[in-house]
Amino acid sequence: MNADVHKNDPASPGTWEAASALAGKFMTFKLGNEEYGIEILKVREIIGLMEITRVPRVTPWIRGVINLRGKVVPVVDLRVKFGMSPTAATEQTVIIVVQCAIGGRELTMGILVDQVLEVLPLEASQIEPPPSFGTAEVDAGFILGVAKAEKRVIFLLDIGKVLSASEALEMATAQTAQA
């Protein structure tokens, strides 16, 4: 093994210290064949797919807005945001409503996912640091870590970092445009 492989790896030489802070319950879901998780405390509710009103002139990953009990909530298509094809509506497609801080603002948004799997309790020993992509220009700052559960690999997302501050502003603009 190359000696430089773990040079900046927080997991070397011992255990990854941040794993204990990440241990807890995660809502897991699928996008395509990949499995992701977000901290359960960020999840407000899960709703079935409903009519999403398109907002003109917004980024393609902003699917639109929904009326959730009188409140206008922007909806992000995570598949598109992550460079996949748009989410197709199936019986398992849902919107996970989350609350997070982005760019210093509290934001409620919906994230469109292919399927919710389970609430998964994770221990520190099951969580590894985000993968290093070497010198490749890959923005993986939104990945908290990678969990190993049974034979599955789950990318743990920092939902507050999936969007940049400017993208959050665009979301807020989409939200107020339809209010």
Describe the role of every protein-language-model region.
Residues M1-A179:
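An acidic, low-aromatic, low-complexity terminal/linker signal
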